Amino acid sequence: MSTIKTNQLAHTANGASVFTLPTTDGSNGQVIKTNGSGALSFGGNTGSLQVLEQFFSPADGSAFSTSNGTITLGNVTSTLNLTTTFQDLPGSYITGYTPPSGTTQVIYEVQFGLRSSDSSAILGGHMVLDGNIILESRFGLRGSTNYSDMLYTFKFGINIGGSTSTTTGRLASWTSGKEIKLQLDEHDSSYEWVANILGNYGNAGHQGATMRPRVGITAIGTL
């Protein structure tokens, strides 16, 4: 295979600029930049925020290769009856995740089925990040006067930089693997909920079948 070598590029049109190429190759992920006078060089993309890494999937045991290792999701095969004690929501786990270098926010998202098995049932939930309950992730639901079926989406942005806060979920830095998950409970045995369930399904009526939650992350930042 032939090789052509040059240190300058120029267009033949009148008034065209002459560009001087870098003398060495750049690193993976770098872009070519100009200094405004025709000298080109490799450097990082310091522009606007962009998605650096993302996955979202049913909790069926799938594995995803990330910039810092493989993340394997849980495999949910049954529903969860809530109690008055907070329980981990099966399938909501993302374990050992480290975002790419340059990440300033990680968005954690879980979508799951719920069915109230009592009238006006009451539910509570929160996100747990690296073993800490995040105060501002708390949420509550109350069912209708009859049974309720719903597909609930929980979404929370974890900001990186500044001071760590278990109130807002902010992390000063994120350079090692952390676990993210949801926990749920119910008010009492007269206000019961079931999670990871498909209740009624249109014309097919009541199903009571297991519905795997969908879980994922989006890492946002600059290269």
Predicted regions, residues:
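N-terminal leader/pro-regions and domain N-caps
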Residues: 45-75
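Extracellular repetitive beta-rich solenoid segments
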Residues: 2-48, 189
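Short loop/turn segments at secondary-structure transitions that flank enzyme active sites
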Residues: 10-12, 38, 60-63, 114, ...
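Terminal beta-strand-rich extracellular "head" domains
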Residues: 71-223
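A short, sequence-level motif marking secondary-structure junctions
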Residues: 22-25, 45-47, 61, 139-145
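A short, polar/charged loop/turn motif at coil->beta-strand junctions and beta-hairpin connectors
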Residues: 3, 46-55, 102, 211
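Short beta-strand element of the conserved SAM-dependent methyltransferase core
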Residues: 9, 42, 56-57, 127-128, ...
